[in-house]
Design a protein with these regions (language model features):
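Glycosyltransferase donor-sugar binding loop
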Residues: 32-35, 167, 194-207, 223
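Donor nucleotide-sugar binding/catalytic pocket of nucleotide-sugar-dependent glycosyltransferases
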Residues: 116-154
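Conserved donor-binding/catalytic core segment of Leloir-type glycosyltransferases
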Residues: 149, 157-187, 195-198
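Nucleotide-activated donor-binding/catalytic signature segment of Leloir-type glycosyltransferases, i.e.
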Residues: 207-225
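Short alpha-helical donor nucleotide-sugar binding micro-motif in glycosyltransferases
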Residues: 224-225, 232-237
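Aromatic "clamp/platform" in nucleotide-sugar-dependent glycosyltransferases that forms part
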Residues: 245
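Short hydrophobic beta-strand element within catalytic cores of glycosyltransferases
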Residues: 262-265
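Conserved acidic donor-binding segment of nucleotide-sugar-dependent glycosyltransferases
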Residues: 277-278, 282-289
Length: 296
């Protein structure tokens, strides 16, 4: 899987598994094969991880591989091939956010090779099970397992502020700009409220948009947060919003629920599997800024 220092959902998922009973009950090892650095460092990191994998492979019965977009899947083909040569059982855990860039793209052959050599392929939702099966006809090999999250945080009480929180990379797919535009429609009605963005990406574009819409004083961009800073901002927030256009199964929504936050999001990826609109979250169509403003 990715490095512990890598930002994103896969790292969050594996860290959550590290805290689970299975990590203590079985002999588990996390081999890091990817990191958010420049090209040469990424290559060195991959080679180091692969050598480590080959070294420990004889001592293990099962190889659990996490993958997503085509570059990740292509790298993991090497691991699967050697695992099967050594007659190991293989699980491939698929975390992608769009079938159009993966199983329904020109890179479909990569996933065909990877998934057909696995003993089991895990996807994050019923929707993704349908996508993958329609593309590759894996049938009984496919299994849905939802992402895990901790429930310990729910036992704590937090002092709240008037904050609407967004956590994730700031890019078009995540819909951060829609959140700025929607909040601009209601900001004057709620002058003591802030929208706070916790994530890297298009921060400067976000600042310019909020200034253009006249809400720059009610908008904060924290950059990427983790550890204490992440804990602090989730505890202080009153509402969580993720206006995504495409997702696998967003860990950020699970994190928000773990902190007891009401969630506003879109019915994409694995969200429809767990969504009960008006009960455990509020939904709106991706890109519907007026509807998002109404939900806020």
């Amino acid at each position: 899987a990715t490095s512990r220092k890598t930002r994103g959902g896969i790292t969050s998922v594996v860290k959550a598994h590290e805290k689970g009973e299975q990590w203590n009950n079985y002999h588990c090892k996390w081999i890091e094969t990817h990191i958010d650095k420049n090209g040469k460092y990424k290559l060195w990191y991959f080679i180091k991880g692969f050598v480590q994998f080959l070294w420990v492979l004889p001592s293990y019965d099962l190889v659990h591989i996490h993958t997503s977009e085509p570059p990740s899947a292509l790298r993991k083909c090497l691991f699967v091939s050697f695992a099967k040569i050594c007659r190991k059982k293989v699980i491939v855990h698929f975390h992608a956010f769009s079938p159009d860039t993966t199983v329904n793209s020109k890179y479909r052959w990569i996933y065909h090779y990877l998934f057909n050599r696995a003993d089991r392929v895990i996807v994050l939702s019923e929707m993704w099970k349908e996508y993958v099966n329609n593309a590759l006809q894996l049938n009984d090999k496919l299994q849905v397992i939802y992402n895990p999250c901790t429930t310990e945080i729910l036992k704590e009480k937090h002092e709240k502020k008037n904050i609407i929180l967004y956590a994730g990379t700031l890019n078009i797919r995540k819909g951060y700009a829609d959140m700025i535009k929607a909040f601009a429609l209601v900001a004057k009605t709620y002058p003591d409220w802030l929208i706070v963005f916790a994530g890297n990406g298009e921060i400067e574009q976000g600042r310019k948009l909020s200034e253009k819409l006249g809400i720059n004083k009610q908008t904060e961009f924290l950059g990427w947060v983790n550890g204490y800073e992440k804990d602090k901002v989730f505890k202080e927030a009153t509402i969580f919003c993720l206006p995504s256009y495409a997702e696998g199964f967003p860990m950020a929504v699970l994190d928000a629920w773990a902190y007891g936050l009401p969630v506003i999001t879109t019915p994409v990826g694995g969200i429809p599997d767990i969504a009960k609109d008006g009960k455990n979250l509020l939904l709106f169509k991706p890109g519907d800024i007026k509807s998002l403003a109404d939900q806020l």
